[in-house]
């Protein structure tokens, strides 16, 4: 989301081509942690490209419920309300920062959280990247599937970059997860 403000709609236009609903939650750069003040511009760009911001919302599916959780660094990662909601089917949680997984309360079903934030480390150097990740992230999750006490989390590398526009040994990914 550091794209030039006048290009956000154009940069996100590829999402309009997806023939399924597309959901999003804001991340730290979208919330100015750090980053320019683009919340209104980003909301407009997402809307124009048929992307539904589900922060603080619940989407009902036949087999599960999807809930959007706000960004941890922006102080919007509240999940205390989850136990008060119907628990008749599993929960899928969409939250930008994987460190949010330890905030998931105990629920009858063991939710799966989908996250990003880490860029997979963006530049992978043996030992160095893991060392740095453990200092800039509470849990140090770079990519993939991790089990936790009250929920599991899948962390995608994603397609974005932060700082230097460069990746090394961490190619961008768009992950497809089949829920069975």
Feature annotation, model-predicted:
Residues 1-52:
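Membrane-embedded segments
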Residues 120-125:
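His/Asp/Glu-enriched short active-site or ligand-binding loop at hydrolase and phosphoryl-transfer sites
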Residues 127-139:
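Short, surface-exposed loop/helix-turn segments at secondary-structure junctions
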